[in-house]
């Protein structure tokens, strides 16, 4: 899976987290592993221009999605596997997101992760124009975001356990994996 990110916003953000959450959601939604995604982080003026140009709405917004290929999440188990495709572009505005994060009482990093999930879901055809669609999309968005956070916690826990095990084995005279087997 190829995920390109370009930060043109002038704001330092954890790009690796945005790639991580996008990759997680794409995987959870059964999108072909060779799919491609582009993410661009822009300033307020650029986002306002895009918002007016594509949505005919004044002022900036937090996230916009521009799908490329028609994709459906999941699919039938007996259907032929689709080939790689270009999901599309997600445009994020960190400055706008920072204001939203402050109002919501959480971090910019959390807001950008949430907006990335939101953007990927739009690329996959989810929308929130109607109340029922909004309910479905926002529930899925919340579930995927929580699952991503849980996967990070689990990875951190596994790394801590591996480090602890290596320390204990080292104290007992055993070498690290990849070294000669048996006691040192």
Swiss-Prot record:
SUPFAM superfamilies in alphabetical order: Metalloproteases ('zincins'), catalytic domain
Compartments it resides in: Cytoplasm
Main location: cytoplasm
E.C. number: 3.1.-.-
Keywords: Cytoplasm, Endonuclease, Hydrolase, Metal-binding, Nuclease, Ribosome biogenesis, rRNA processing, Zinc
Residues spanning the signal sequence: none
UniProt record, GO biological process: rRNA processing
Cofactors (names): Zn(2+)
InterPro entries documented for this protein: MetalPrtase_cat_dom_sf_prd (IPR023091), YbeY (IPR002036), YbeY_CS (IPR020549)
Root EC class: hydrolase
Entry binding sites for Zn(2+): 118, 122, 128
Role this protein plays: Single strand-specific metallo-endoribonuclease involved in late-stage 70S ribosome quality control and in maturation of the 3' terminus of the 16S rRNA.
Family: Belongs to the endoribonuclease YbeY family.
Designated name of the protein: Endoribonuclease YbeY
Gene giving rise to this polypeptide: ybeY
């Amino acid at each position: 899976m190829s995920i390109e990110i370009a930060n043109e916003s002038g704001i330092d953000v954890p790009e690796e987290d945005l790639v991580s959450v996008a990759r997680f959601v794409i995987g959870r939604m059964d999108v072909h592993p060779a799919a491609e995604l582009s993410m661009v982080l822009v300033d307020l003026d650029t986002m306002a221009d895009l918002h007016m140009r594509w949505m005919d709405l004044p002022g900036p917004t937090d996230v916009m999605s521009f799908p490329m290929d028609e994709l459906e999440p999941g699919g039938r188990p007996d259907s032929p596997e689709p080939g790689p495709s270009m999901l599309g572009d997600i445009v994020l505005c960190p400055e706008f997101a920072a204001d939203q994060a402050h109002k919501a009482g959480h971090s910019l990093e959390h807001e950008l992760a949430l907006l990335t999930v939101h953007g990927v879901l739009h690329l996959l055809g989810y929308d929130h124009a109607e109340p029922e669609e909004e309910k479905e999309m926002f529930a899925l968005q919340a579930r995927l975001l929580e699952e991503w956070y849980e996967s990070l916690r689990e990875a951190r826990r596994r790394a801590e356990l591996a480090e602890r095990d290596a320390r204990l084995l080292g104290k007992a005279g055993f070498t690290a994996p990849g070294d000669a087997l048996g006691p040192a």
